[in-house]
Structures are given as structure tokens and as C-alpha cells.
């Protein structure tokens, strides 16, 4: 057990999925040719005035509602002054003293324990552009400049990389379930800065924190935190903490698995915040507040409903609500008539178990209606579970219709009791000696009889075979 305690706070930048940018009317589409979606406001040209996007404010209110945070009806935008090539105005429009979203909290589960992580604030700001470094040149793409961001700042309440990842995954699911962001980490819609420090256990003092910048995958976030903790502990134990652990911003080298120094960490005073004179103070009227606080069912609420109403186990309910796509697929199966238990098994075990590489629920070729039909045919006794797996393999490889495949593959079960009884009587008659042994106490022979009936019937319903065979054997 380590003699040190890890202190972690996270700042997450969520790109809001508005159709236009936060302070102008340019499109926010990803992947367009460089500098296509720009205007005088994006470019920071003299005389261009920002106009606040109402939809961005509404989405911020929705997030605050989801985490039970204070919503500040009055807030102010401020200029955050710094120079960087992808920031054409030489300042970023952000919020400082009065953010739209105040204190809230997010509950996580980690290592079979529940913990509440405080959220200090969430404020709106504009994104910067993007620097592209090629050979001896650096290029600037300002398509992303002025895109709306919601920066969510946690309290330093996390004590391990596992807790940090649990918090991030929960936050990721919240913004996805709210529908305020696609939270695509590969495209930069969900980016994280981690603030990491250590201290001897039992010490209440907060020591030097190091910021690790722009992490965009759960895997790399965890590795970056773990490396940084090890680096700081090693420096402490070697007596080099004061010289090697300084307040700075570091980058994570994904190839080497280490963090390296990028620049000294600025304090708020270094940014010289002041209210933006081009933007009026924000007042959230009753109509906008009413729209913002109206949110869909959140992951925790959905999980409780699955447990209490559908009778699912907590673990299974947690798996289904860990992803918006999974939850929607599952509920669509229920709407098509599949049972909760059948939908759960065939979605999470059979279908997901067959997804490999880049194949996803959206690209696997089996939609929720098709899988629900397969589940219903099994539950109706028309086919066996084994046959269902064969059909699912074909569906994923070639597609098709469940009922047509049942017929063409000859997988329909025999459910006619008369036909099954005839086969049972034939098997028992041909094995009279074994029937006598069974009746004298050799119960294991029951499996032999079942096997013979299944073999001779070529597709009898196993459940009915068991029931009718027991009746015949007495």
C-alpha cells in the first residue's frame, strides 16, 4: 500500500452540438476544408461584434439541471487574454467570476463503492482554432474557432486514476444522454485536462499540482495520471520534489507513455480577465429556463427503472445504461415485443460478443427490430436458442429476414405434442432394457432418452421433449 495520497481534479471541455457557433452564425460541422466556416467574428477582425447563441445557453442549463447544480440567472462573459497562433483575437471569450452553472455533483461507482464528486462550476466559452504542423511549416485552421464549449471543472475529490476514469465515463454518458454533445473524443468534442498532485497520507496540505493537457481517450488519461503520480512520488522519495515538481502544464507522450513539460502553468491573474465590453450581461428569462431544465431520463434514473420495473440485476442495468446507443437499442427491442431478459441476453452477450474491430451496433447490420424478432421466435418456441445463434451469425454476415432464414435453414422446431409423443414412444420401445434400468434408479439415463428423441425427431422443442418424456417415464 502506498504511503502517498493522490489528489486529482479534472477540467473537461465539452463541445456543444449547436448548428452554429457560439458568437456568430458560422456552421460547426466537423471535417470541412480548412477555414471554410469562418467570418469576421471568427477571424477577430476589427469591428466584428459577437452575438450570443441562445441554444448554447439552453444546453448549459440542461447540464446544470442534470447534476443538480445552481443555475445562475445572471452571468457575465469575460475576456481571457493570452497569445497563441490559433487565437486570432489574442483573447478568448469565456466566463470567470459568474458562470452560468454553479456548484453541483456527480455520483460515481468505482471498485464496488459509491462516491460523490463535486463539480465546482461549468461555464460557456469559445474554442480556439487548430494548429497543423507539417514539415517546416505550421498552418492554422479556424473552422473550430468560436465553436461553443462547456468547460466543466471538478473539485479535487478523486483519489486514483480509476476514480478519475469513472467520473469521466459518467460525465460522458450524462452529456450524451442529454443530447447536448456527441462527445466524440477522437474528433475533440470531449477533451480533458487533469490536475494531479500527491501528499503523504494523513497530511491535509495541498501540494504543487501539475496540469496534463488535452487528453482525449480514457486509456491515455489513465496512463498519463498513473505516470505523473509515479513521477511525483519518485521525486519526493529522492528528495527532488521541490526542484522537479513545479506548477506547470505537461503533455502526455502517447508513444513513450510519459508526461513532458510544455510550459509554466498560468494563474488566473496572468490572463487578466475582465468583462467583455462587446457582450451584455446574460439574463436567463423564464422561457429559456423552462426549456433548459426540461431534460430526458438520465443514466441513473434509467438504471433504477430497469432494476425496479423490469427486474434486471444492478450490474446488467448498469451495462445497458453505460452507453446511450445500448440503452436506445434495448428499449427499441422492448417496444418490438421482446422480453427484458431476452433482449438483455441477446443484445449484451450474443450481439455485442460478436462485434469485432471497428464494427459497432450501428454498422453490424442487425437492427433492434430484427434482433427483437429473433428473441421472440425463441421465446415462442419456434426455434431453439442454438438455432437462434446460427441465424444471428448469418444475419451479421449477409443480413436477411429472421422468419425467412428459419424456413430456408430448416430450423423450425416441432411443437406438436402428438408428433413428439410418437417419437418418444418409438425411442422407449427400442430401448426397453434402459427404461427398466432408469426405473430401477439410474436417473442419468434420462439424458440419453432426451438425446435419442432429439436425434430422431430432427427439431423437436427441447422443453416439450423434457416435459413429455418425464410424463411417459412416470
Swiss-Prot record:
It comes from the Bacteria. Coiled coil: none annotated. GO terms for molecular function: asparaginyl-tRNA synthase (glutamine-hydrolyzing) activity; ATP binding; glutaminyl-tRNA synthase (glutamine-hydrolyzing) activity. It catalyses: L-glutamyl-tRNA(Gln) + L-glutamine + ATP + H2O = L-glutaminyl-tRNA(Gln) + L-glutamate + ADP + phosphate + H(+); L-aspartyl-tRNA(Asn) + L-glutamine + ATP + H2O = L-asparaginyl-tRNA(Asn) + L-glutamate + ADP + phosphate + 2 H(+). GO terms for biological process: glutaminyl-tRNAGln biosynthesis via transamidation; translation. SMART domains: GatB_Yqey. Keywords: ATP-binding, Ligase, Nucleotide-binding, Protein biosynthesis. InterPro entries: Asn/Gln-tRNA_amidoTrfase_suB/E (IPR017959), Asn/Gln-tRNA_Trfase_suB/E_cat (IPR006075), Asn/Gln_amidotransferase (IPR018027), Asn/Gln_tRNA_amidoTrase-B-like (IPR003789), GatB (IPR004413), GatB_C_1 (IPR042114), GatB_Yqey_C_2 (IPR023168), Gln-tRNA_amidoTrfase_suB_CS (IPR017958). It holds the Pfam family GatB_Yqey. Its EC number is 6.3.5.-. Belongs to the GatB/GatE family. GatB subfamily. Allows the formation of correctly charged Asn-tRNA(Asn) or Gln-tRNA(Gln) through the transamidation of misacylated Asp-tRNA(Asn) or Glu-tRNA(Gln) in organisms which lack either or both of asparaginyl-tRNA or glutaminyl-tRNA synthetases. The reaction takes place in the presence of glutamine and ATP through an activated phospho-Asp-tRNA(Asn) or phospho-Glu-tRNA(Gln). Heterotrimer of A, B and C subunits. This is Aspartyl/glutamyl-tRNA(Asn/Gln) amidotransferase subunit B.
Amino acid at each position: 500500500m502506498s504511503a502517498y495520497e493522490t489528489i486529482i481534479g479534472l477540467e473537461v471541455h465539452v463541445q456543444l452540438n449547436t448548428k452554429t457557433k457560439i458568437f456568430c452564425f458560422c456552421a460547426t460541422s466537423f471535417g470541412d476544408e480548412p477555414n471554410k466556416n469562418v467570418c469576421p467574428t471568427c477571424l477577430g477582425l476589427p469591428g466584428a461584434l459577437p452575438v450570443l447563441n441562445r441554444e448554447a445557453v439552453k444546453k448549459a442549463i440542461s447540464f446544470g439541471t442534470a447534476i443538480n447544480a445552481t443555475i445562475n440567472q445572471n452571468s457575465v462573459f469575460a475576456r481571457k487574454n493570452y497569445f497563441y497562433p490559433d487565437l486570432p483575437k489574442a483573447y478568448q471569450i469565456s466566463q470567470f467570476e459568474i458562470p452560468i452553472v454553479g456548484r453541483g455533483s456527480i455520483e460515481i461507482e468505482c471498485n464496488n463503492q459509491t462516491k460523490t464528486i463535486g463539480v465546482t462550476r461549468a461555464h460557456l466559452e469559445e474554442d480556439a482554432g487548430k494548429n497543423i504542423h507539417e514539415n517546416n511549416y505550421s498552418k492554422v485552421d479556424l473552422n473550430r474557432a468560436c465553436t461553443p464549449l462547456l468547460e466543466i471543472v471538478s473539485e479535487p475529490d478523486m483519489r486514483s486514476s480509476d476514480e478519475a476514469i469513472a467520473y469521466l465515463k459518467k460525465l460522458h454518458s450524462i452529456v450524451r444522454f442529454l443530447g447536448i454533445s456527441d462527445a466524440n473524443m477522437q474528433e475533440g468534442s470531449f477533451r480533458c485536462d487533469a490536475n494531479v498532485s500527491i501528499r503523504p497520507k494523513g497530511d491535509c496540505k495541498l501540494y504543487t499540482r501539475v496540469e496534463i493537457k488535452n487528453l482525449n481517450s480514457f486509456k491515455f488519461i489513465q496512463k498519463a495520471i498513473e505516470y505523473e503520480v509515479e513521477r511525483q512520488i519518485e521525486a519526493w522519495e529522492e528528495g527532488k520534489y521541490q526542484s522537479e515538481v513545479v506548477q506547470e502544464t505537461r503533455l502526455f507522450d502517447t508513444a513513450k507513455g510519459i508526461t513532458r513539460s510544455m510550459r509554466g502553468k498560468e494563474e488566473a491573474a496572468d490572463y487578466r480577465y475582465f468583462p467583455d465590453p462587446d457582450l451584455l450581461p446574460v439574463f436567463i428569462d423564464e422561457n429559456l429556463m423552462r426549456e433548459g431544465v426540461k431534460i430526458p431520463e438520465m443514466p441513473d434514473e434509467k438504471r433504477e427503472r430497469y432494476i425496479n420495473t423490469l427486474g434486471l440485476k444492478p450490474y446488467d442495468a448498469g451495462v445497458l445504461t453505460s452507453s446511450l446507443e445500448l440503452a436506445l437499442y434495448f428499449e427499441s427491442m422492448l417496444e418490438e415485443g421482446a422480453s427484458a431478459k431476452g433482449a438483455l441476453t441477446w443484445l449484451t452477450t450474443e450481439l455485442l460478443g460478436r462485434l469485432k474491430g471497428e464494427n459497432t451496433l450501428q454498422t453490424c447490420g442487425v437492427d433492434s427490430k430484427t434482433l427483437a424478432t429473433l428473441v421472440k421466435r425463441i421465446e415462442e418456441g419456434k426455434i431453439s436458442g442454438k438455432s437462434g445463434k446460427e441465424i444471428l451469425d448469418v444475419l451479421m454476415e449477409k443480413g436477411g429476414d429472421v422468419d425467412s432464414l428459419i424456413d430456408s435453414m430448416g430450423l423450425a422446431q416441432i411443437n406438436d405434442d402428438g408428433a413428439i409423443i410418437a417419437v418418444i414412444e418409438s425411442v422407449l420401445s427400442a430401448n426397453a432394457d434402459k427404461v427398466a434400468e432408469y426405473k430401477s434408479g439410474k436417473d442419468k439415463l434420462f439424458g440419453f432418452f432426451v438425446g435419442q428423441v432429439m436425434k430422431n425427431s430432427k427439431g423437436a422443442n427441447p422443453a416439450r421433449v423434457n416435459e413429455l418424456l418425464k410424463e411417459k417415464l412416470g
